[in-house]
UniProtKB/Swiss-Prot annotation:
It comes from the Bacteria. One of its GO terms (cellular component) is proteasome core complex. PROSITE patterns: PROTEASOME_BETA_2. Na(+) binds at A161, C164, T167. This is ATP-dependent protease subunit HslV. InterPro entries: ATP-dep_Prtase_HsIV_su, Ntn_hydrolases_N, Proteasome_sua/b, Proteasome_suB-type. The active site is at T5. It is an enzyme of class 3 (hydrolase). Protease subunit of a proteasome-like degradation complex believed to be a general protein degrading machinery. Gene3D superfamilies: Glutamine Phosphoribosylpyrophosphate, subunit 1, domain 1. Belongs to the peptidase T1B family. HslV subfamily. It comes from Pelotomaculum thermopropionicum (strain DSM 13744 / JCM 10971 / SI).
Length: 176
């Protein structure tokens, strides 16, 4: 299975940024790609979405989520809840192994296959193998610096890449 990545999202000062590394790992010991894009712009470029987990599963979920965004006219929270319900109850979808971070100008959410839609209290979220490291770094930077959301996301991911062997420093950041 292809897995292992880090995605971090930061909301600060009316802006949101989502950063992802570029590494794709096969099994436990083989890097097969260094420059993968794990963040997408959805629904008329008004929503950012990043994934951690199986690439094929994530692409399926991106497509489903974009359909929900269209169905609910860009309402991120409603689309996220409906995706989580489908993901949890559908016999095929519930086998998908991935996590999503989605954000628009007002909301930042983590969506999981077990039906959770989580909005972080502090405007910072991270998923994937390096997620705990990126989350800690981003929280510290939000609390103790005047850095912008994009710079915090980039630096938090750089810290995770220094620690997590499944995360590289080929960082892509998208912002709204």
């Amino acid at each position: 299975m292809f897995h292992a990545t880090t995605i971090v999202a930061v909301r600060k000062g009316g802006k949101v940024a989502v950063a992802g590394d570029g590494q794709v790992t096969f099994g436990q010991n083989t890097i097969i790609k260094k420059g993968a894009r794990k963040i997408r712009r959805l629904y008329k470029d008004s929503v950012l979405a990043g994934f951690a987990g199986s690439v094929a599963d994530a692409i399926t979920l991106f497509e489903k989520f974009e359909g929900k965004l269209e169905e609910y006219h860009g309402n991120l929270q409603r689309a996220a809840v409906e995706l989580a319900k489908d993901w949890r109850t559908d016999r095929i979808l519930r086998r998908l192994e991935a996590l999503l971070i989605v954000a628009d100008k007002e909301n930042l959410l983590i969506i999981s296959g077990s039906g959770e839609v989580i909005e972080p209290d502090d405007g910072v979220a991270a998923i994937g193998s390096g997620g705990p490291y990126a989350l800690a770094a981003a929280r510290a930077l939000v609390r103790h610096t005047s850095m912008e959301a994009e710079d915090i996301a980039r630096e938090a991911l750089a810290v995770a890449a220094e620690i997590c062997v499944y995360t590289n420093d080929n960082i892509i950041v998208e912002r709204l």
